[in-house]
């Protein structure tokens, strides 16, 4: 990590009266309507039970849900394995990478090998574009100056999270915050039944492209508002990218895909999203107490 470019700060959740801490992942979860797992599984069962070509052929609703759960656990493990590899490349040396490949038997794991190839190809392009690695997996926090009133109480709040990686381009003087994705796809186009996000984000479709963008913009806000970057508090100096490193090639033959933000940065909009999420958290928590 370059101490000259990044000022690490210790994030502590201090107990303060009527002060709410909320993670960015919780913020994002409040933006989407709850997933109706049982309902979707039922429709999947009805559409595929008698189809011998379907992976859900002769599967019960319970078995379908179990399949989804198992698939999610496997994807999560591969995501962790990829993060470990990225750490070896960015923070280690060639021997660290060799040891990783040996321990994970990457030669005989086609899925992990593809995740790795996707990262290697992207990182090669990134370096050729003039970007140097700064740091990775750092905790950040954004304490809003705004207050939230519910009933006769006023609340303050802090949003917390951890970004994947930060790079810097000496030629342009610009930073780049990256969020790695390794499972599923980045949905950029709505389908027939795609709804909208909730609260102030209802102007956007319920696509992960929008929620991932919101996540990255939180990191950007936290880095700048906390003065964690060298010589800049200007939002124009920090770019963000969603980088998908899946287990398969895309239609164009590329092993990875880099996505620009789904919408333009707007701090007022982000503040409204954070305030919405905090209000929702307070109200939902109060219902649990009752």
Predicted regions located by residue number:
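Charged, glycine-rich intrinsically disordered N-terminal tails and low-complexity linkers that flank
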Residues: 1-85
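Generic structural signal of hydrophobic/aromatic residues within well-ordered alpha-helices
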Residues: 27, 31, 41, 45, ...
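Short glycine/proline-rich turn/loop motifs
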Residues: 64-66, 197-202
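Catalytic cores of nuclease domains that cleave nucleic-acid phosphodiester backbones
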Residues: 70-199
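Residue-level preference for long, well-ordered alpha-helices that form the structural scaffold
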Residues: 108-111, 115, 204-212
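Metal-dependent nuclease catalytic regions and adjoining charged, substrate-binding loops involved
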Residues: 205-213, 217-290
């Amino acid at each position: 990590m370059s101490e000259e470019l990044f000022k690490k700060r210790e994030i502590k959740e201090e107990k303060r009266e009527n002060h709410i801490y909320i993670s960015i992942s919780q913020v994002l979860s409040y933006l989407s309507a709850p997933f109706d797992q049982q309902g979707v599984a039922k429709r999947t069962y009805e559409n595929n039970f008698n189809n011998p070509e379907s992976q859900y052929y002769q599967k019960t609703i319970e078995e379908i849900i179990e399949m989804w759960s198992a698939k999610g656990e496997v994807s999560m493990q591969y995501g962790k394995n990829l993060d470990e590899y990225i750490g070896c490349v960015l923070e280690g040396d060639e021997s660290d990478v060799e040891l990783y490949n040996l321990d994970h038997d990457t030669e005989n794991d086609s899925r992990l090998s593809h995740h790795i190839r996707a990262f290697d190809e992207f990182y090669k392009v990134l370096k050729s574009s003039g970007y140097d690695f700064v740091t990775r997996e750092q905790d950040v926090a954004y304490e809003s100056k705004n207050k939230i009133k519910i009933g006769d109480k006023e609340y303050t709040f802090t949003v917390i999270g951890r970004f994947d990686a930060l790079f810097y381009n000496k030629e342009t003087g610009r930073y780049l915050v990256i969020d790695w994705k390794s499972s599923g796809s980045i949905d950029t186009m709505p389908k027939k039944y795609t709804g909208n996000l909730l609260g102030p984000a209802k102007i956007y479709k319920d696509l992960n492209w929008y929620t991932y963008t919101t996540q990255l913009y939180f990191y950007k806000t936290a880095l700048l508002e906390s003065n964690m970057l060298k010589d800049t508090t200007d939002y124009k100096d920090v770019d963000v990218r969603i980088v998908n490193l899946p287990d398969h090639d895309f239609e164009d033959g590329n092993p990875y895909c880099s996505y620009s933000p789904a919408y333009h940065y707007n701090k007022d909009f982000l503040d409204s999203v954070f305030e919405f999420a905090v209000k929702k958290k307070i109200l939902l928590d109060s219902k649990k107490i009752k």
